[in-house]
Structure formats: structure tokens, C-alpha cells
Amino acid sequence: MAVISMKQLLEAGVHFGHQTRRWNPKMAPYIFTDRNGIYIIDLQKTVKKVEECYDFVKQLAGEGGTLLFVGTKKQAQEAVKEEAERCGMFFVNQRWLGGMLTNFQTIRNRIDRLHELERMEEDGTFEVLPKKEVAQLLHEKEKLDKFLGGIKNMRRLPGALFVIDPRKERIAVAEARKLGIPIVAIVDTNCDPDEIDYVIPGNDDAIRAVKLLTGKIADAILEGKQGEQVAE
């Protein structure tokens, strides 16, 4: 059975690209036509590409690999968090901190600090400290949790990235490319597909489109994990 249907893609508005004046010519192979100054993405190609990405992600999870979901634009934040948590993977949905991959050890130190503050809150340490100090520590914990909460259990670099809007997440894409980490991405008509290993041509601005495609990637992880359990 197909991973995704044309009907699902149409209903979620995955076919709506950007305005024709804001396009990347490298996306031409994925464009079906233009209508009223907006590019329409060829959904037959999207169906095929979703299947390729699904297979890659399923295999990754089946081999015990991890996927980092990245989407910091408003339309993506909720779907990224929900779907990553649903399939037990990691996510960044607030702001990509430079060096999250290329300087991972420093980031791990900040994560260790977050774990330390969480322990202090749980084991009663906060109760014996002055109120002012506790307020400062809680503020520090909230800030760390906001930016690093989605990767706080990521002990090592991820096996791959799933990115919504590689143009917006260009720092994440550059870091992954530098380290040779494969990238799966929803790529709209204004993005450069050459930087992405597994391209899903589609609308990266509509919440429903983002939710649908992100959900399929999470499904692939869950299916791959089941295979991993069977293999064991």
C-alpha cells in the first residue's frame, strides 16, 4: 500500500508552492505548473519522494539509528514536538543554537547542567536554598529546557536530520553536511534541493501540510522500531 495518497496531499495543501518570483530554478523538476502567480508542486513526484524518505527513515530506525526533527518556524513548532515525541525521537523547535552538531560536546555540557538543575528541583535541594537563588536557578532551567529540552536525552550525534524548510534552517543543514549526516527535508519551491539527501517537494508553510508529512516520518520511525524489535 502507498505510504501517502494524492488525496491526502491535496487536502493538506502540500501542492501549493511559493510565489513564482520567489523560486529556486533547481526546483523546476518538481513543479507541475503555475497558477495565479503561485507554483503548483507535482504531487506525483511528492508521492514517490515520500516513499523514498519513508524507506530510508524506516531502515535507519530498524538499525537502531536516531533522527533529529528540526523546525523552528511557527507553522512547524507544534508538529515537530508532537511527532518527535510520538515516535520517541529528538527535536529542535525553538531556535537552532550554532554548534548544536558541530560543537556537540559544548552543547552536551549545557544539557548536563539542565539535568543537574532538574535533579536539584526533584531531590529537595531547592527547598533549602534562599528564595532568590532558587528563582535564578529556575529561570536558568526554563531557558535551557526551552532550547535544549528536545535533545536532552540525545547522548550522541543523530543518524539523520528531518528538516522543515532548509532555507530557514540553513545553519542546521550546513552543520549536518559538514559532518556527513544525511538530511531528509520538506523542500518548497524557494529552496535549494541540492543540499538535501532525501527531498520531499512540498508546502513548508501550511500547518496541515507540515503535520501530514512530519507524521509520515514519525510513522516510518515507529515501523522501523517494530522491525528492530522483531530482529532482536
UniProtKB/Swiss-Prot annotation:
<dbReference type="InterPro" id="IPR005706">
    <property type="entry name" value="Ribosomal_uS2_bac/mit/plastid"/>
</dbReference>
<keyword id="KW-0687">Ribonucleoprotein</keyword>
<dbReference type="InterPro" id="IPR023591">
    <property type="entry name" value="Ribosomal_uS2_flav_dom_sf"/>
</dbReference>
<dbReference type="GO" id="GO:0003735">
    <property type="term" value="F:structural constituent of ribosome"/>
</dbReference>
<dbReference type="GO" id="GO:0006412">
    <property type="term" value="P:translation"/>
</dbReference>
<dbReference type="GO" id="GO:0022627">
    <property type="term" value="C:cytosolic small ribosomal subunit"/>
</dbReference>
<dbReference type="InterPro" id="IPR001865">
    <property type="entry name" value="Ribosomal_uS2"/>
</dbReference>
<dbReference type="Pfam" id="PF00318">
    <property type="entry name" value="Ribosomal_S2"/>
</dbReference>
<protein>
    <recommendedName>
        <fullName>Small ribosomal subunit protein uS2</fullName>
    </recommendedName>
</protein>
<dbReference type="InterPro" id="IPR018130">
    <property type="entry name" value="Ribosomal_uS2_CS"/>
</dbReference>
<comment type="similarity">
    <text>Belongs to the universal ribosomal protein uS2 family.</text>
</comment>
<keyword id="KW-0689">Ribosomal protein</keyword>
